[in-house]
Amino acid sequence: MERVSGRLEKTVKIGYQDVTIERDTTTFQKQTDAYGEYEHRKNTITIQNGLQPLDEANTLLHEILHGVAYINSLTQSGQPLDKEDREEVVINTMTNGLSQVFRDNQWLLPYFKDKFK
């Protein structure tokens, strides 16, 4: 795996963790294969190399939301996302919804950036 370079940073802060962003040169052939993965034990997000920009952004957001869910204990036993399939449905739904909101409202991310100073 090579480190992400270019427009993406090498790390993203999620809660108290600095999570490393890496690229994976694996090419996924099946429709059910993932484009990325969040590994809490390694503190990494891995993204498939060569994705289209929209897919790459959606994948990064998806994996960040997995990190948010894990770091905030939503995946612990007895919590709302304690089952892997439930977690995946919720994360995927929220990711796709937010991606659409950000894409349809180009002013929104700069607005948040200004307000979150």
List each model region and its residues.
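Metalloprotease/metallohydrolase-associated module, dominated by Zn2+-dependent proteases
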Residues: M1-D55, I71-K117
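Active-site recognition of the HExxH zinc-binding catalytic motif
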Residues: N58-Y70
